[in-house]
Curated annotation (Swiss-Prot):
Native source species: Zobellia galactanivorans (strain DSM 12802 / CCUG 47099 / CIP 106680 / NCIMB 13871 / Dsij)
Top-level lineage group: Bacteria
Region (Disordered), start-end ranges: 22-72
Biased composition (Basic and acidic residues): 39-54
Membrane topology of this protein: Lipid-anchor
Record EC number: 3.2.1.178
Protein name: Beta-porphyranase C
Amino acid sequence: MIKTLKRIPLVFLIAIMACSNSGDNGKDKVEEQEQAQEQGEKKGQGEERDKEDGIDGLQPTFLADQDPKPDDKKWIKVEGVSDEFNDSELDLTKWSPTPEFIWNGQDRGWYGGSRSLFEADNVSVGNGFLRIEGEKFDSPKYSPKDNTDTPPQRRYGGAYVYGKTLAEPGYYIEARMRASKTAMSAAFWLKTETKPCGENLNDGENLEIDIQECVGVFTGELGDEWTKDDWAVNANWDRIFHYNTHRHNSPCNNIGDRQTKGGKANFDKKNSDEFHIYAAYWHADGSKIDFYIDGELEKSITPVIPFKGALRLIMSSNFYDWIEETSAEDMGFNRPLEDRYTQFDWVRVWQLEDL
């Protein structure tokens, strides 16, 4: 910035100094220039990362012959649920950094697994990334909804960031993301709003689309029944592309056990070692969801029922209930802060329009 001022002609500087309140105005001007430069540098960082990956950011990420767009349509970005994270703070007009969700005077938010606590303090934006810190507390904590008559059990801190604008059927939803180097999860997903079943937008159904869920460090599992199969236990949870559609039990459907259809693929490297672009094309009629990795179709899923209603878009980091607890060192919680971040480079959501 000093070099920039040196380039300004001396006569011009004298004229500025002669003006009333010139000191304050000059300071304000310099601060504005510094802020603009900082934002430009951050934007440049994101653009440079996109260039390295061969992405222009003006269209969804697809490899050759992978774009499902019909010839008479074009992709348009849905700005309300898209973000490059190039500002210095989270855009609170788009995102909530806390799971708190007050409906009819009741907090219907979900604050994490039984050993985890979602806290807004673990959410930050910097260097062109949305960052969710994973931490091990010095002592267990309560969530705002816990029964304080029993000892607290929440020992690990993460966060839950959700979009204030709901995602709709017909959207192509993608994020460039990397897991932390801890046992915390890294997840990009959609879920029915936590309203009473008769008041949500899914005809009372409690639906979920997991575009990606993994962990940064896999320490083993506790032996819950659902993890006692080859699909889960031996899935290499710290080097996985893991996607699902869930139809959960609710008072309105009484289906009993959750109904799930999904799949997985494994990477050569760990989820914490490299960024990937995780995406899903949610067909407009809700009958099918196509899951993509780095612009390539991995699998098309037909949910057990059509997913026809709008869902909440979520970025989160949780300590899964089925993960085995080992030492803080082994689980990565003694690592430097930068290693304990789950990072989202950007989130981009698209819809089709007529040409």
